Curated annotation (Swiss-Prot):
Keyword entries, A-Z: CF(0), Hydrogen ion transport, Ion transport, Membrane, Mitochondrion, Mitochondrion inner membrane, Transit peptide, Transport
Pfam families recorded: Mt_ATP-synt_B
Record-stated family: Belongs to the eukaryotic ATPase B chain family.
Gene source species: Kluyveromyces lactis (strain ATCC 8585 / CBS 2359 / DSM 70799 / NBRC 1267 / NRRL Y-1140 / WM37)
One cellular-component annotation, GO: proton-transporting ATP synthase complex
Role, per record: Mitochondrial membrane ATP synthase (F(1)F(0) ATP synthase or Complex V) produces ATP from ADP in the presence of a proton gradient across the membrane which is generated by electron transport complexes of the respiratory chain. F-type ATPases consist of two structural domains, F(1) - containing the extramembraneous catalytic core, and F(0) - containing the membrane proton channel, linked together by a central stalk and a peripheral stalk. During catalysis, ATP synthesis in the catalytic domain of F(1) is coupled via a rotary mechanism of the central stalk subunits to proton translocation.
Cellular location(s): Mitochondrion; Mitochondrion inner membrane
Keyword presence, Aminoacyl-tRNA synthetase: no
Cleaved signal peptide residues: none
InterPro entries (alphabetical): ATP_synth_Bsub_B/MI25, ATP_synth_F0_suB
Protein name in the entry: ATP synthase subunit 4, mitochondrial
Gene: ATP4
Stretch forming the transit peptide: 1-30
A GO term for molecular function: proton-transporting ATP synthase activity, rotational mechanism
Amino acid sequence: MFRALTLKASARPVVAGLCSRQAPIAAVRYMSTPSPQDPKAKASSILDALPGNTALSKTGILATSAAAAVYAISNQLYVLNEETILVATFTGVVLAGIKFLAPAYNEFAENRVKQVSSILNSSRTKHVDAVKERIESVSELKNVSDTTKVLFDVSKETVKLEAEAFELKQQVDLAAEAKSVLDSWVRYEASVRQLQQQQIADSVVAKVQSELGNPKFQEKVLQQSVADVEKLLANLK
């Protein structure tokens, strides 16, 4: 009880001081305002700042808050002081900031969402185009089985021709090798025959020369020659 009386006594000079402070402020505001604001517009702005979806709910919230504030102040459950004014001023600044900055933030958010949506749509379009191009490139290969079959037949024929060509080449190489061996054998036989003939000729010449060096053979040849000459002379007579 004593505490309640003390609070009432301390609240009276504070309220009086606040009233004396608010009087010149109101006068200055009145003198600095160029034109009075429309009460309907001001009420609409206050209602718009309150939470809620309908005007009835916003009005109920405002009336309930005002009644609670009046009840708290009248019963001195809450003492109006400088902190209350500071909180009210801060709340007003915050609400004003929300009111004026919210549209700019909404515009920024909408632009950002549009930008991201544009990027996503562009990426989706590019992806769809890439998929379509891939489908078209794959559809061009729908006859790949027939083409592969033809190429396989051609490759089989090519392998067969290559095998035949390799076989013919082996035969030609074998014939050339056989001809080379035969030619070398003929050359060897010719060289052996020539060597044998040379040896025979050399032996005959050596034998004749040895016979010519024999005096008996020389005398025999001389007698045979004289006989031949006499025979020729006899025939001439």
